[in-house]
Design a protein with these regions (language model features):
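N-terminal entry module detector
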Residues: 47-116
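Core segments of cupin and vicinal oxygen chelate
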Residues: 14-17, 23-61, 109-110, 159-200, ...
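Short N-terminal helix-initiation segments at or just after the protein's N-terminus
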Residues: 14-27, 62-66, 92-93, 99-107, ...
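Conserved short beta-strand elements that form part of the metal-binding/catalytic scaffold
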Residues: 42-76, 119, 125-134, 180-214, ...
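Conserved active-site tyrosine of GNAT-family acetyltransferases
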Residues: 32-37, 95, 124, 167-171, ...
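Vicinal oxygen chelate
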Residues: 2-12, 18-27, 70-162, 189-194, 238-358, ...
Length: 358
């Protein structure tokens, strides 16, 4: 299936500050609370029998994550904060010119957030744009509450889409800037990292069957905080929640850990990427066959990390249909009979890394 190109609107795009929160549907609120609050230590801003509003320790807006009880695990919204109330108007007009479905609620879609617009964007993702929000206590100095694995900030989203190049152009029109990408010698793009704040990304595009949500990522201060989370999961006999890592990414240079929540939603714990705020910040391009692009130490990527992702919902709360990627898949070209990776590009031996062997 050939996807149509996305036109560049004449309307001014909203001035997006950062990724702000994700609204996800879970099938067992109690189990999700145990994972996000009891194990990961996110702060409960407020909760009811049907929803829990969570934030990280340095956050001052109402929440970074909403857990809502529902029949199917999925993502209801990926929300971005904009610079002013007028930027909500700009977002609505921008997507209306694109021909996207929009819904505006002056009272907000969730507690703690005011005037907002949600859209079904050209890639099929449920985006939200808002400015007005309830301020809450920033707990950065409350070391009596923070554990050694404290999650201090929401860092980024990651989205799965069939055509990364198409999505990249759309997000660049929206004002995002590319910091890193993965390509092959033929120019096929497998992934791209896009930012608004001065880090490596606020969201990333991963090539695959989509629209689906690959992961939400929270930052810790240092890598030892991630090691503690691993130790805690081991002590609780919940090491099966660890999908991948800990390790260091090549892309972003960040230390990472990937977990799966009780519904399979993927959560990354992430720390120590780099500053990208200068206007001439260079794009870093990785070869898809570079064995150190996804893990700087060359450790293999588990297949589920490539294949599994969360469904996303339309504005009526129904799962969006997904479209398969037709370009080469990153897993296929790097692993297995038809794939190869290298540790040193000029080596004669090329294969794929399994354990300690190439």
């Amino acid at each position: 299936m050939t996807l149509s190109s996305i036109p560049t609107p004449t309307a001014t795009p909203p001035d997006i500050l950062r990724c702000a929160y994700m609204d996800i549907v879970v099938t067992d609120l109690a189990k999700s609370r145990e994972f996000y609050v009891d194990i990961l230590g996110l702060v409960v801003t407020e909760e009811s029998d049907t929803a829990i509003y969570l934030r990280s320790f340095e956050e001052f807006i109402h929440h970074n994550l909403v857990l809502r009880q529902g029949p199917i695990a999925a993502v209801a919204a990926m929300a971005f904060r904009v610079r002013s109330p007028e930027d909500v108007d700009l977002a609505e007009a921008y997507y209306q010119e694109l021909g996207c479905r929009t819904e505006r609620r002056t009272e907000g879609f969730v507690k703690g957030v005011g005037d907002s617009v949600r859209v079904e964007d050209p890639l099929g993702f449920p985006y939200e744009f808002f400015y007005a929000t309830t301020h809450v206590e920033r707990l950065a100095w409350r070391y009596d509450l923070q554990g050694p694995g404290a999650l201090v900030r929401l860092d980024h989203f990651n989205q799965v889409t069939p055509d990364v190049g198409r999505g990249r152009g759309y997000l660049e029109d929206l004002g995002f800037r590319v910091t890193e990408d993965i390509k092959d010698e033929d120019g096929v793009t497998y992934a791209a990292w896009m930012r608004r704040k001065d880090t490596v990304h606020d969201t990333a595009l991963t090539g695959g069957t989509g629209p689906r949500m690959h992961h939400i990522a929270f930052a810790t201060h240092e890598k030892h905080n991630i090691i503690y989370i691993c130790d805690k999961l081991g002590a609780l006999r919940k090491s099966d929640l660890i999908e991948r890592g800990p390790g260091r990414h090549g892309v972003s240079n960040a230390f990472y850990l990937y977990l799966r929540d009780p519904d399979g939603h993927r959560v990354e714990i992430y720390t120590q990427d780099y500053y990208t705020g200068d206007p001439d910040n260079p794009v870093v391009t990785w070869n898809v066959h570079d064995n150190q692009r996804r893990d700087w130490w060359g450790n293999p990527v588990v297949p589920s990390w490539y294949t599994d992702a969360s469904l996303v919902l339309d504005l009526d709360g129904n799962p969006q249909p997904v479209i398969a990627r037709t370009e080469s898949s990153e897993m296929a070209v790097t692993v297995g009979a038809d794939g190869f990776s290298y540790t040193r590009k000029d080596d004669e031996l090329a294969g794929f890394k399994l354990g300690s062997t190439l």
